[in-house]
Amino acid sequence: MYIAGVMSGTSLDGIDVALVHIEGSGVDSKIELIHFTTVPFCNDMKNEIQQALSIETSNVQLICSLNFKLGLCFANAVKEVCKEANFPLRQLDLIGSHGQTIYHQPKQEGNIISSTLQIGEPAVIAYETNTTVISNFRTMDMAAGGQGAPLVPYSEIILYRHQTKNRLLQNIGGIGNVTVVPSKRSKESVIAFDTGPGNMVIDEVCQRLFHVPYDQNGWIAKQGVVVDEILTYCMNHPFLNMKPPKSTGREQFGEAFVTELLNRFKKHSKENILATVTMFTACSIVHHYKAFILPYYEIDEVILGGGGSYNNTLVEMLRNGLREEKCSICIQEDIGHSSAAKEAIAFAILANETYHRNPSNVLSATGAKNSVILGNITFPPYADENEANI
């Protein structure tokens, strides 16, 4: 099957689309990446999304409108990846669309129950592409008592399980998340959880203090020095000592977190603040390994993915933090994969599993009570001989 996986993450840097060919289903699936592209959000769209993400500025009319606007953006991004790959859109069997997360409440707080909302109307995507769309992957896991995240571990088992090596898959997107993938000969279970901020705090500081979207290659942070009092403040965040399974997001490490941090520590130089929040991401990852993984698993290899794997300063901080551990550290490209395409590929794989009526949540990752089939199915408006028959 030819499937387009569509991902718009918490970093808001654009729409990632992976055109993937998948043979079979389950852990023995054969996955081939045909083409990957990122379609950036225009400034107006990015501003609308940021407005919708903030409780202070959001409103129901905006979210309602944005749901349809993003659906059109996602459809156009699918058309773009097919155009770049010289692949006929009519031959596409499925689209797996994660959507744009507007709010994620992993655990109940008072009368606010655990819930999640991703937008990007699948009917618009299906209409514009005349292709079956599978979307809204997180809600069924939450209905089954899970946190709806992380969902990527299922794809990581398929793509990265090694015959003899125990691997850690560390994604550094807006949020950091880790998956422990034991070797095929191991009897240990897969576990996965969010490790805290990935690029989210770094990018927000860059945009506010340096007026650039992100710290390319970690060059700005390299000019500063880590400030202990800022790092201690960050590392005291209660999320870090919660036991897995757990997930987090912009609600904990978004604009409000950065505003409070900058107000508290405005006496320090811009470069030092950026260096410190970069170290915060590295230390939060290392902390989670040492607290929740390394005492129970012998790890051979750490594989970094996501945009943060291109931040050389951050990667060097991670290497220093893990220097005493007996494991190698590499990035996705070192083993023939794409750091940028990883999550979009994951949602193509999840769409394929839903098409085959296979459960694809990992209970040890999300905390769900049951293995469940993820996602909602939206059929295209017109019958087509190439349409996937679900």
From Swiss-Prot:
GO molecular function ontology, one term from the record: phosphotransferase activity, alcohol group as acceptor
Gene3D superfamilies the record matches: 3.30.420.40
Reaction catalyzed: 1,6-anhydro-N-acetyl-beta-muramate + ATP + H2O = N-acetyl-D-muramate 6-phosphate + ADP + H(+)
Pathway noted in the entry: Amino-sugar metabolism; 1,6-anhydro-N-acetylmuramate degradation; Cell wall biogenesis; peptidoglycan recycling
Superkingdom of the organism of origin: Bacteria
Matches recorded under CDD domains: ASKHA_NBD_ANMK
Binding-site positions, ATP: 9-16
EC nos: 2.7.1.170
Keyword Transferase in record: yes
Pfam families in UniProt: AnmK
InterPro entries for the chain: Anhydro_N_Ac-Mur_kinase, ATPase_NBD
GO term, biological process aspect, one: 1,6-anhydro-N-acetyl-beta-muramic acid catabolic process
Keyword annotations from UniProtKB, A to Z: ATP-binding, Carbohydrate metabolism, Kinase, Nucleotide-binding, Transferase
Family note: Belongs to the anhydro-N-acetylmuramic acid kinase family.
HAMAP family xrefs: AnhMurNAc_kinase
Function statement: Catalyzes the specific phosphorylation of 1,6-anhydro-N-acetylmuramic acid (anhMurNAc) with the simultaneous cleavage of the 1,6-anhydro ring, generating MurNAc-6-P. Is required for the utilization of anhMurNAc either imported from the medium or derived from its own cell wall murein, and thus plays a role in cell wall recycling.
Record-given protein name: Anhydro-N-acetylmuramic acid kinase
Source organism (scientific name): Bacillus cereus (strain ATCC 14579 / DSM 31 / CCUG 7414 / JCM 2152 / NBRC 15305 / NCIMB 9373 / NCTC 2599 / NRRL B-3711)
Gene behind the chain: anmK
